[in-house]
Amino acid sequence: MPKSGQPAQNTYFCNMNTSNAEIITHQWFAGKWKPRPADGHKGTFGHLLLIAGHEGMIGAAVLAARSALRSGVGKVTVHIPRCGRDVLQVAVPEAVLQVDESSESCWSSLIDLTGFTAVAVGPGLGTDGETAFALRTLLKALLERETAGTPLPLILDADALNLLATDYQLLSLVPPHSLLTPHLGEMRRLCRALDLPCEELADLQVAARMLSDSLQLNLLLKDHIPHLFIPEGRLLVAEGGGNSALAKAGSGDVLTGLIGGLAAQGYLPEEAAGLGVCLHREAGKIAEARHSAPATVASDLVDAVGQAFLHLLPPH
């Protein structure tokens, strides 16, 4: 029996049907991409708030911030614990730093959301008690904005998802149409918290479909072939097979930065996820060609994003 307040067990056992899935191709990417006005300024292209980093995991914040800036977003502010200030300032000079007021090592303080056009939370965040409280407070603030008709797109990844699994009732605070981006391990933790079957990949896909439809959330299940579950039964699937060049620590942080930056530019969360997946996979191919699959690291993916855009977008 699922946890109290969650859908009954017989509502999520169903046959996964991918025959009507949309395929994320180069053509799909080009069709979704919006031309950038030549007279635009940084305000035209959005402002991402990235909440990331913990003592010992500041590199995740660096990777996510660098990739977000490569996505085309006008401005990125990184909320970081004090221990990461100097690292971020040097590694990502283009980012604006918002240093946590209360903690040396983790996210613990409240954040003013004024001026941001999207929020991404999770890379290298840690799961401290102070961070769990800060996440709850943020979700409540975003849910209030949703109710008031001034929603902010939200992307939850990595330790933000692990915190949801630790306290499954936080799921009820996640605003509709937000995007969750679990890899298979994170998805299993969420499933176990909700008493959902999770042993096989098919179990995880069924659970993703159930969560997407019942909570009106977008859910990107990250595997060698990513599946994007969208409410009302929609499904997007990445074209082609896997690429082991992407199977490296930090790869998911790069994807989160890309998706967050795209959402901040005004793309719907599901559009940002599809575009981000396509860019990420293309960057993986480019990095593999440059470095080989074994030698590719997450920073190589960030460095390949510009070339990925050139491959994916038709010449002017």
Tell where the protein language model's regions lie, with residue ranges.
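Small-residue (G/A/S/T)-rich helix-start motifs and N-terminal tracts that mark the onset
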Residues: 3, 11-154, 162-179, 184-316
